Amino acid sequence: MRATTATIDLGALRHNLNLVRQRAPGSRVLAVVKADAYGHGLLRVAPGLAEADGFGVLRLEEALALREAGYRQRLLLLEGIFSMDELGAAAQHGISVVVHNAQQLAMFEAMAAASVKPISVFLKMNSGMNRLGFKSQAYKQALQRLEACPVVADVSLMTHFATADEERGIADQLKEFDAVTAGWHHPVSLANSAAILRFPEAHRDWVRPGIILYGASPVSGVSAASFGLRPAMRFTSEVIAVQTLEAGDILGYGARFTATQATRVAIVACGYADGYPRHAPNGTPIAIDGHRTQTLGRVSMDMLFADISQLPDADVGSQVELWGEVVPVDAVAEAAGTVGYELLCAVAPRVVFKVTG
């Protein structure tokens, strides 16, 4: 069997969840598991996050899968509902819903009170990111309309920060949110991963960790390890062939690499069809038998190349870490000009997944 494997470490997930609790000891934790748990597999990771106070998902189907698997804590649809049928299903299964636009609000008002169990709602403010949510001048009226709906059990308040991971920080958005909601007595959820780590003033009643649960960094240029995080995914394969190049020999499609001296090259069973970034350049970090080295040439559909000139023991069958413990996913992402989030979410269905811990 082809060796390309993603191993999910439940112990690392538990560790990272505990770190969130240490950072925000007064807050409940809504573990964000959208996008199939950032590519790790929703029902694979759920046991490692079972002590979370709730789960944030994108699609109703994800919430129903968690309910069917026996998870009884709060489930929150982060984009809300898109039809009256979805609203009814959310009510039936005790799923909380974000409301971020007038159309969703109107659906709540149109739902007959006797037909569903009351639903917990998170009302989203657009405090400056300009993606989802009611602008500040419309926010109070939206709250009043929701609270007048018989199908609404309770309302929490939320917003999302655009630059919690950057030098600009959250001050402007936090000021906007606090000014509008001053004197209100509702549970509040503000902090994403970066804000959990950097801005304790935003922790409030609920925090919403995402990428940090999976052991990657939300802050460019700052390692996950420096925050005490552990990688939840180890993406591995093996060497399936070795070639020795002479000076002047080219390597792979497009001749992206030309040897300037004798070079030993490992051919690794992993390519862009497995989720490795095709645009990763020469020099992207990779580990062979636990030793860090670098890629060479262009990534192809099923294979990539690694320099083993300084690893005389490396040969066919040697173990390869694409990212994980020796090579953080953020290091590969930085070399490829992207973010760890994208790489984790892009691991392909043909990769074998295993669970440990």
From Swiss-Prot:
PROSITE patterns noted in UniProt: ALANINE_RACEMASE
Protein's name in the database: Alanine racemase
One Pfam family linked to the record: Ala_racemase_N
Record field: catalytic activity: L-alanine = D-alanine
GO BP annotations listed: D-alanine biosynthetic process
GO molecular function: alanine racemase activity; pyridoxal phosphate binding
Modification N6-(pyridoxal phosphate)lysine occurs at: 34
Keyword vocabulary terms for this entry: Isomerase, Pyridoxal phosphate
Species in which this protein is naturally found: Methylobacillus flagellatus (strain ATCC 51484 / DSM 6875 / VKM B-1610 / KT)
Gene giving rise to this polypeptide: alr
